């Protein structure tokens, strides 16, 4: 009986240690983990999309856009989606405005700017630029971004592109 109690206590200790380490993630540590990811959205100065994503995202990474319930995709699709921004919005920039850390979650409020090179989401090319807010909730696991919930205000961006 004492062997089982000892094992249970050890498991509890291990669980609390991992929770404590997740809770001790500082803003500086969070920024260091997420920085390579956000550098990919600064299209003009980014590096190789695939190698950076493989560095910061585990193979079981999930990206959930939130536009449709349950709409999530994996790392390979994310590499394609992020890679396509260079073609559609060649001057795209992501400016991190705020980072909040809670346990293993990192919330990022950012501003995205850019000028589409052609039609964007059905809006004909106008040569106009847009500025929109983006909110991301990143789950950090083993020093990598394991899951992202993200919402960008594309409605506002498209409205700016359509404006007279």
Model-identified regions with their sequence ranges:
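Bacterial N-terminal signal peptides
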Residues: 8-16
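Short acidic-aromatic low-complexity motifs
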Residues: 23-60
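Bacterial N-terminal signal peptides that target proteins for export
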Residues: 1-7
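Exposed beta-sheet edge and beta->alpha loop/turn motif
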Residues: 111-141
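Low-complexity, intrinsically disordered terminal/linker segments enriched in charged
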Residues: 23, 146-164
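Sec/Tat signal peptide C-region and signal peptidase I cleavage site
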Residues: 18-22
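A short, structured loop/turn motif at beta-sheet edges
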Residues: 99-107, 139-146
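A solvent-exposed, acidic/Ser-Thr-rich amphipathic alpha-helical stretch
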Residues: 50-103, 111
């Amino acid at each position: 009986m004492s062997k089982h109690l000892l094992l249970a206590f050890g498991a509890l200790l291990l669980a609390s240690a991992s929770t404590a380490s997740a809770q001790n993630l500082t803003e500086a540590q969070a920024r260091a983990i997420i920085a390579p990811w956000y550098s990919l959205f600064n299209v003009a100065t980014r590096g190789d999309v695939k190698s950076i994503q493989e560095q910061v995202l585990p193979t079981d990474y999930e990206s959930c856009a939130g536009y449709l319930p349950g709409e999530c995709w994996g790392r390979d699709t994310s590499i394609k989606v992020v890679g396509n921004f260079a073609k559609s919005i060649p001057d795209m920039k992501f400016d991190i405005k705020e980072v909040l850390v809670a346990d293993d979650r990192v919330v990022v409020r950012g501003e995205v700017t850019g000028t589409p090179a052609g039609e964007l989401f059905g809006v004909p090319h106008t040569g106009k630029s847009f500025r929109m807010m983006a909110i991301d909730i990143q789950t950090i696991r083993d020093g990598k971004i394991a899951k992202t919930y993200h919402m960008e205000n594309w409605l506002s961006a498209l409205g700016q592109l359509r404006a007279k």
